[in-house]
Structures are given as C-alpha cells and as structure tokens.
Regions:
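Short helix-coil transition sites and intra-membrane helix breaks within transmembrane domains
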Residues: 32-42, 80-91, 123-127, 268-278, ...
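Helix-loop-helix hairpins and the membrane-proximal interhelical loops
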Residues: 1-60, 133, 140, 194-301, ...
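Transmembrane alpha-helix interface/packing and boundary motifs in multi-pass membrane proteins
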Residues: 27-41, 70-83, 158-163, 262-272, ...
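A structural-propensity feature for long, helix-poor, extended segments
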Residues: 68-79, 86, 301-326, 330, ...
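Membrane-interface alpha-helices at helix entry/exit sites of multi-pass transporters
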Residues: 58-62, 99-116, 292-304, 332-335, ...
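Re-entrant/interfacial helical elements at transmembrane boundaries that shape
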Residues: 41-51, 64, 79-99, 130, ...
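Flexible loop linkers connecting adjacent transmembrane helices
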Residues: 47, 81-109, 134, 138, ...
C-alpha cells in the first residue's frame, strides 16, 4: 500500500469544498430519509444518483456515501422513538432502544446509537482500506473462467437474501436474468427480443430507471394503497432530546460492544448479499452471549443499542470491499454505487487498483468523511430529528414520485425511461404485495451481464470445453463456496420456517 498516496488522497478529498458540501448534504438527507419508516438508504441513493451525473466522480460518490451512512443511522431514530425501524437494519435497535425511550432515556439511546454508528463506520472504513487491496491482488489472477464463477457465487447469494421463500427469490432472480437478455447481444451485437425500431431498448433496460421504479415508485404505490384503505397510521413522538453524545461513563461501558459490533458488521457486510439486517442480529446475539448479565438485554440497556448500531454502519465499509476489489456489490446500495462508477467510465474490480489507484484511495477518504459528516449531522440535529417521524405520508409520497420520475428522465432526457420507471414501479408493487423479494432482482440485474459475457469468452477460449474450468483452483473455490452458501441458506431458512410454524401453532393452541 502506498501510504504517501493514501495520505495525499485524504488531504485532497477533505480539503475540497465541493466534496465536503456534497457529503454533508448526503449525510443530512440520509438521516432525514432513514428516520422515516419505510424510507431506506437504498431508496435515497437510487433517487439521487441521477442528480450526481453532472458532478465529478468523488463529489458524486461522497454524496451517495453520505446518504448511505446517514440512512443507516437515521433508521434508529424512529426505531427508538416510536418502535418503528426506519430501515430493516434498524430492526434490532428497537429491542433495547425503545425500552430506553419508555424509561425516559430517549436522548441517551439516540446519542449511543449515533456514537456507535459513527465508530462502526470508522472501523468498517479502516478494514476496507487495508483489506480490499489484498483481495484485489488475489483477483489479478482472474480470467474469464474465474470471473464467471465469481458471478455465479454472487448469484448464489440470492438464495441467502430470498427471505421466507427461497423459491420466490429464485423466481425474482430468473425474471431479472431474462430482463438482462433484452437488447443487443454483448458478443455479436444482434438484437434480442426487440426490433430495430425499439431504440429505447437497444442497450437493454436502463439500470437507474429500473432501480428507481422497483424501490421508490413501488413504495409510493403501496403507500397510496394503504392511505386509500385507511391502513396508513401517522406516528408522532413528543420526546425532548437533551444529550447529543453519550457521557464518558457510558462510553467505557459500551466500547467492547462497539468494537465487536463494528468488526462483525464489517465482515458480514463483505459477504455479497448478506447486509446489515443480518449483521445487526448476529452482533446483538454475540453481545448478549458474551455479557455477564444477558437477562438485561431487551429491557433497555445501552449495550444492546451500541452492539446493533455499530454493526449496522460497519456494514457500509464491509460492503465496499467486494465492490472495489472484485466488482461485486456487497449489498443493494453498493450495487447502485457500481452503476455510478460504470456511468463515470470506471469499472470497479482488481484492475481499478492498477489503473485508478488514486481514485480508490479517494473513495476510502470519502467513506471516512461520510461517517464524520453523519456524526456532525447527528450532533447538530439530534434534538430535531424526532420531528421527522411525524411527517405526513400524504405530503411525502407525491414529492418522492416527482423526484423519481425526474431522476428517470434526467439520465437520457428520454420519456421512454420514465415509462420504464413507472412499469417497474408497478412490477415492484405487485412483487411486494405477493411477497416476492426485490433484492434478488437487483443482484441478478448487476451480475447477469457479467456472467453472460465471461461465460461466452471462456467457452470461446476453451473451444466449448466447459469442464476445463475444473483445472482452475480459484474457480473451484468460488464454486464450492457457492454450493455451501446455497445448502446452508436453504437449511437455515427451513429451520426458521419450521420454528415460525411451531410458534404459530403454539399461539393458536
């Protein structure tokens, strides 16, 4: 690692007024959005990525990373104050955060959440800085066969993120893989499933309009449906916040939870598709198991909040490791960041550490800056963020819809993209309605073309002999890990479903 270049990259990024401003705005927007139940960091990044096209790479990445980190912390605000996690990853925070609020310790819970989230983010950024170059060095030996098996490994993670039904997750992924085949064949340029008159689909379905439709427009449609049915209940909080940071006594008590949570979050975040919602519960369970008083967890103690929030934001650095070093997104937000890099003419992966090393180091600096901005935003606004949970959804949904459609249009200045955005909004709404997960679609949409291109290249090199791939140790490692991920995920999900069925039967008895 070139430490002089790393330090100069930090100096360049942290002294750039545009980067500072964009990252701060991103952190502020992320916290505000994350505090509203149902509004995730993924949605925030998807909404704003079209508006980053006119910026240079690092200011735009700073904006998106600010939203990412801010949104991860923002979800804890509503979880603590009104027992409604703003993001899925904040679900474990309410286990101790909300009981603290009911004890009259809302300010303390929010300050612990903010401090732990910042520390977890810093741990994740540091691990990313020193680990991702090592992974990239290993990946320099990858050829088309290894890249194909890497994509297969990434696709195998779909089973892990499919939720209650593996079958529905696979159906979502299969649907997305079919979408990837629309447009010009990447190897011979022959149009597939379109005519030459359908110019809007020559390059396939544009990533950003599809993404905005699936994650933002679908939520607007679902929200309007809830309002019409009278199922959308406005939630308010009247808590007065006094402390902006935990006192030294509390910090001494929670630092082991922060350290372990940050490391757990980072390493789970580095597994493509795992995500913060898994990391927070693993961290919470580990913290509870290691405690001398596990019976206190769930009654409202700072240790529980610290363990979950440090893991929550630690995932941000972890998820960037496979993105930068392998070109495989670690979660849905880094999948969007992958699209942002590609649209700026930079392809993440091992070659990025050879041809774009200063850019890589500036991304490291931008992530650290994003966590610092999140802390500043939290300190300045923690007394007022409680008001965010009281925003009427009737006012919020039209604003989100307008921003979504403008974002879809702004990419190519093409009304066709707006139609694609709306169409995928309806598809996303229907899939959510019938409990088909959306994350597998996103993962398959990113990895599908990578899988196809490298498979065709490999088969051409090997003259049709696919089984020659068994001679590559790296490819076989990815294949083995993919099989283990699938088997473990199916086994684990079947256990969860059986336990849920047994609990339901017990309640009905």
């Amino acid at each position: 690692m070139d430490f002089s270049l790393l330090l100069s990259s930090y100096a360049t990024v942290w002294s750039n007024p545009e980067v500072l401003l964009m990252t701060f705005i991103g952190a502020l927007g992320g916290v505000l959005l994350g505090a509203i139940p149902g509004m995730t960091a993924t949605m925030g990044v998807a909404l704003l990525i079209p508006f980053s096209f006119g910026m240079d790479l690092i200011p735009s990445i700073g904006l998106l990373l600010g939203i990412y980190c801010g949104g991860m912390y923002g979800g804890s605000i509503s979880a603590i104050l009104i027992h409604a996690p703003g993001t899925p990853a904040a679900a474990a925070t309410l286990l101790d955060g909300y009981p603290m609020c009911k004890k009259g310790q809302a300010g303390k819970a929010l300050s612990v959440a903010m401090f732990a989230s910042f520390c977890g983010g810093v741990i994740g950024a540091l691990v990313m800085t020193f680990l991702s170059p090592l992974v990239a060095d290993m990946a320099m030996n990858f050829g088309p066969g290894e890249m194909f098996m890497l994509a297969v490994f990434g696709l195998s993670v779909i089973v892990a993120i499919s939720g209650k039904s593996v079958a529905k997750g696979l159906i979502s992924a299969f649907f997305s893989m079919l979408l990837c085949t629309v447009g010009l064949d990447p190897t011979n340029g022959i149009p597939r499933f379109i005519t030459t008159k359908q110019t809007g689909l020559l390059d396939g379905f544009q990533f950003i309009p599809t993404l905005i439709g699936l994650f933002a427009v679908s939520e607007v449609i679902a929200g309007v449906e809830r309002i019409i049915r009278g199922e959308e209940h406005e939630q308010k909080s009247n808590e007065k916040i006094t402390n902006v940071l935990p006192d030294w006594k509390t910090i001494k008590k929670i630092w082991p939870n922060i350290l372990s949570g940050g490391l757990i979050g980072t390493f789970i975040g580095a597994i493509p598709g795992a995500g913060g919602d898994i990391a927070v519960f693993v961290s919470y369970g580990a913290s509870k198991s290691a405690s001398k008083h596990p019976e206190l967890y769930g009654t409202g103690i700072p240790n529980g909040v610290a363990a979950t929030e440090s893991a929550n934001n630690g995932c941000s650095g972890g998820a960037m490791i496979p993105l930068l070093s392998l070109g495989v997104p670690g979660d849905s937000v880094t999948a969007i960041l992958l699209g942002a890099f590609i649209m700026k003419g930079i392809t993440p992966g091992p070659m990025m550490y050879v041809t774009e090393l200063p850019t890589v180091y500036r991304v490291f600096a931008a992530l650290m800056l994003a966590n610092l901005c999140m802390l500043v935003v939290g300190c300045l606004g923690v007394r007022f963020f409680a008001k965010i949970v009281s925003v009427e959804k009737k006012m919020l949904y039209p604003i989100i819809l307008v921003i979504s459609l403008l974002g879809a249009f702004s990419i190519n200045k093409n009304a066709f993209d707006v139609g694609v955005c709306v169409a995928f909004g309806i598809i996303g709404w229907l899939m959510n309605k019938y409990e088909f997960p959306l994350s597998p679609i996103l993962l398959a949409l990113i990895l599908g073309p990578m899988c196809e291109k490298n498979f065709v290249r490999y088969m051409n090199i090997q003259r049709g002999n696919f089984f020659a791939i068994t001679t590559s140790p790296i490819a076989m490692v990815f294949a083995t890990v993919a099989i283990l991920v699938i088997v473990y995920s199916v086994y684990n999900q079947s256990k969860i479903n059986k336990r849920a069925a047994a609990n339901a039967a017990q309640e009905n008895a």
